[in-house]
Amino acid sequence: MTPKNFEFQPGAILHDAIVGTFRAHGRSFEAWCKENDVLPSNARNATFGQSRGPKGRALLARLIEAAGPEFLRLAYARRIAEYADTVKKGAA
């Protein structure tokens, strides 16, 4: 899968990665929402996968683009790997 067609799985890990990516760039999730006339609750619903309709998917795409897809992909992959390690340790 190339970075161009990489699909993020909505959920807590993606939400944390998006928030972290904004912070890493000196911005905030809430500030982006305010600048873009988006209710933070709607943005959270999109990142957590609670809003999977056309509007929710479009909002998620905007958030991913604003966060920086390449940097976000790295942050997301790191968080997924950390979670997988936690699961492995818990299952042992």
Can you name each region flagged by the protein language model?
Residues 1-24, 72:
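A short, Lys/Arg-rich alpha-helix, primarily the initiator
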Residues 19, 30, 61:
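Residues within the helices of the helix-turn-helix
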Residues 71-92:
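Short, charged recognition helix plus adjacent turn
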